[in-house]
Amino acid sequence: MELLILQGLQQDIKIFLLSPILCAIFRFLFIYFFAPNKTYKGQEKKWCSCFNYGFWWGMDFNAYVLLFLFLLVTLPSLGLESIYVHGDSIRVILGTLYFLVVYIAFLGKLIFYYHYKDTYNSNLRLGRNADKRNLLDIFFNQNHGGWILLSLPIYTVGIYYFLSWILALGTFAVPTVHLGYIYYVYNALITIATVIVYYWFRYGGTFKHRNKPEWDTVPEVVKRDMFFAKACIDDLIAFELAIRAKPQEILAHSDAETIQILTPLIKVEQDLVGTIWNSMRKKAAGPRIKKPKKIFLIVEESYSQFAFDDIYKDIPIANAGRLIREQSSTISIDNFLAGGLISQPSISSMLNGIYDVNLELNEKAYFWNHQLPTSLGKQISELGYTCSLWYGGSLSWSSLGLFAKGNGFHNIYSGFDITSNDTPHTWLGVYDHLFLEGIQQKLDENNTDNYEFHFIYTTSNHGPYTIPIEKYGFEKEALLKELPDYLHKHTEDIGTYAYCDYYLSQFVRYVQETYEDSLVIVTGDHTRRLPMPCQDKGRVHRLREDISTAFYLSHKDFDKSLLNGVRIGTHMNILPTIMELIAPKEYEYVSLFPSLFEQQAFIVTPYHWLSNSHIGFFKDQRVETLEGTPVYDYNLKDVVALQRAYMEVTGAIVRHQL
C-alpha cells in the first residue's frame, strides 16, 4: 500500500510555503509605499530582522494552512475516494479563499495606514457607528475604491490558476508498505509529526507558548524604526490584535482591583465613586477677566499643531490661523493632546469631562438623560450661560444631538438646520464656510445681551477632500504657484486645510469684532498627518507632529504672559481653565484635570502622554523629546500607572452609574 498520506502532505506543504512568501511580498509592498526611510544599504540587519520576525509572527495564522489542509483534505482522502480524486481542486479552492482574505487584509491595512498612520488598531471597532456614506465617499474618492474592487476578481483568478499550476508540479515518490499494521503506524506517526510541526511553526519556532512572537519581543534593531516595527506584523495578526483589544475590560474589574489601580491618582478608603468625585472638586481662585457675555469653544475638524510649526511657515496652509495666534491678546500652546485619537472619543471626553476610553459613552442611553458632575454643558450653564451646540453635520452622528441634550446644552443645531436645503455638503456635513455663515446669521438674528456659551464643531477638514475650494477663493493654479513642486500632488489636501483654516479664522475675527468681550477658544478634535513640507527623504514625522492638536484662546484683556509659560495642555484642561478665568472666588466646580494656570508635570490620556520635555504614545511604547529625538530607555512605569488610573476612573464611574 502506498503511503498516500505523504503525497497529500507534499501538496499541502506547497500551499503552506506560499503563505509566508505572499505575506513577505505584501510586507515589502507596504514598506515600499509608506516607509519614511527605505534605505537598505547600511541597514541590512533591520530589514532582515523585520522580515525574519514577521515570518515567525505570521505563522500564528499561516501555520493553520498546513493543519487545515492536512485535516480537511489529506486525511479524509485516505478513506474517501471522491476527496482523493478531487483533493487538489479542494486544496486550490481553500488556498484561494485564504489568500483572498490575506489580500483583503493587506488592502485594508494600506487604507487604514493612509488615514491613521498606524496598522489596524482599536479605532477599527469604532467604525460600526461611523457615517457609512462618508466611509464610502472616502473609499471611492480618496482611496481609489473602484480599482481596489476591480483588483479582487483579478487577484482571485490569478491565485487560483497559480495554485493549480503549483499543485500540478511533480511530487517526490512515496514508499510502499506491504504490512497493514505498519501502514497504519506510519500514517499515525506522520499525522502526529504534522501536528507537532504545526505547533512548532505556530509558536514561532518553539514549543513554548510564552515564547511566541509578540510586540514586546520585536527585535530592538527593528523597534528603533517604528515603521518597520509595525511592518513586521502580518496584516491578519494586526487585525486580530485590534479586535481583541477590548476597551470593556475596565468594566469587569472589581472595586478592590479599581482601588489598587487608582492609587497613583486617588487614594480610596471607602465609598469608591464618592471619593472619585470628591477628588475632582476644585475651588476657583477668583475671576481673572470680567465675565464675558459670549464664550465660543470652537472645535475644528483635524486642526493640527504641525501646521503652525516653523517648518510650515512658507507653506500656505494655515496663514490665516497664524495671524490670529500672533495677536497680542491670543495665547497658544504648541504641545496639546486631544482626549481621543479620532473624533468620537475626543468629543465624548471633552463633553463628559472623563475619558471615553473608546467605550462610546455618547452612544449609551444613560448619557442622553443624565449628566455627570464633570459634564461641560451642565457646569457652564450653572454659571448662568445659555449653552448651544452647533455641529456641521447631522445630529444623528454618534448620537450627538441626544448626547449634547443630556450633557446640559439648551439648544442643539445641525448645519442642515441653519442653512438652506440646497446647501452643498459632504457626507459628513455642510461646507465649513457655509456652516459658519449660518451660525453668524443666527447669532445676528438673535442678538441679545444674554450670557451665551457656543460649542461649535466643524466637519470639512476631512477626507476625501472633494470640496471644490476653487469656488470659494482658493484657485488651484494660484496654490500650485505657491507650493514647491514636490507638494503639487497634495494640492487638494493642503488646499482643503487652508480653506478650513481661513474661514475658521474669518469667523473668529467676526466674533472678536461683534462681541468685544468674548472669550474664544479654538482647538482640533484630533490631528491628522499633513504632507511633509520638505524634501529631506531622511526626515520622518515626529511623534509630536502626529499627535499634538492645535490650541489657542483669545480675549481682549489677555496678554501672552497670562499662563506663566505653560507649555503643555489637553482638552481636559479647557473646562477648568474657563472656570478659573470667570468663576467667582471659592466657586466649586468638578474637573478631572487642573486648569492651564497650574504647571503640570505630566499630561496623560488613554493613548498618549506629555511632559515638559518628552512625548509618548502608549500603543507603540514610543517616546521622543518634544524636539523629536527618539528616546529608547525612558522608564514608562509611572506614566503607564497614571494611564491605567485615568482609564479606571471612567470604568468605575460607568460601572456604578449606569
For each predicted feature, which ranges?
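A sequence-level detector of short, solvent-exposed, charge-rich linear segments
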Residues: 44, 70-74, 78, 116, ...
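Solvent-exposed soluble domains appended to multi-pass membrane proteins
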Residues: 267-658
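Transmembrane and membrane-interface helices of multi-pass
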Residues: 1-250
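Exposed alpha-helical structural elements
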Residues: 4, 8, 46, 134-135, ...
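Short, highly charged low-complexity linear segments
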Residues: 129-137, 168-173, 256-262, 363-368, ...
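The feature marks either
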Residues: 140, 225, 232-237, 241-279, ...
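General structural signal for secondary-structure boundaries
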Residues: 39-46, 116-124, 140-145, 247-264, ...
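Glycine-centered secondary-structure boundary/capping sites
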Residues: 80-84, 117-123, 137, 143-145, ...
